[in-house]
Amino acid sequence: MTENSNDFSQLRPGLWDTVNERYPDSMITRDELVPLVRPVKTLSESRVTFVSTAGVQPRGTLPFDTVHPVGDYTFRRVPSGSKPADLEIHQLKYPTAGAKRDLNVIFPTERLQELTADGIIAGLSENFISFIGYNMDAERLERTLAEDIADAVEAEKPDVVLLAPA
């Protein structure tokens, strides 16, 4: 899709065909398109929230269950005003050394705060959302965790949601 394109009908035509071919035994298949919505506000007028699979959470909160064989189907709210020193990573499924040196690499709280201070974005939601991406039960992921996260994001009332895998 080009900058001047008026085709906002779907993110990637044929996406679900590719997913369904790659994972033929998956319990979840899709054939409908993924609709896109034309933004109604500029970024400088938009409230932004962030959702990540990095397993980042406020220090002192219940750690994610990183050793359960099918994963952890919970999420954590992370105050958007957090500093990296206020946060920790509970994740065993990817190397975290780089992220521990600079958490903004995977959970950019300070960069988003700077964009707000510079007026690039209007503001941040009260909380960001974090969970661990290692979840082996696709049906449970979709029917519980994804629904819970969607409800939590909706409650933050953002205009824009940034989604980032770890």
Show which residues each predicted segment covers:
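Metallocofactor- and cofactor-centric catalytic cores in central/energy metabolism, strongly enriched
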Residues: 1-166
